[in-house]
Amino acid sequence: MRIISYRAVREFKQKHPLASVALDRWYETVAEAEWASFLDVRLFDNSVDYVGDNRYVFNITRNFRLVAMVFFAPQLVYIRFIGTHTEYDRTDVTTV
């Protein structure tokens, strides 16, 4: 998959160093993936949630969430939000 918005990952890691290793692992694994469907995403991470309009919520360690739009045909993952669980709870992830 090609991931768009690495800048968001880099900036979040600077603010939240505890998430750094997990975000790097997520990024590297997704970059190597070739997802064709939600089932493939679920095989990667069985806790991922589909929230509509191509948006998926990934748990990054215990306290961090990443919302990305996944487009299977062109093999694109567009990061829309990275935040703490508290920030995630205050965000309408269906519109980010």
Segments (PLM) and residue ranges:
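Basic, Lys/Arg-enriched alpha-helical interface segments
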Residues: 1-64, 71-78, 82-96
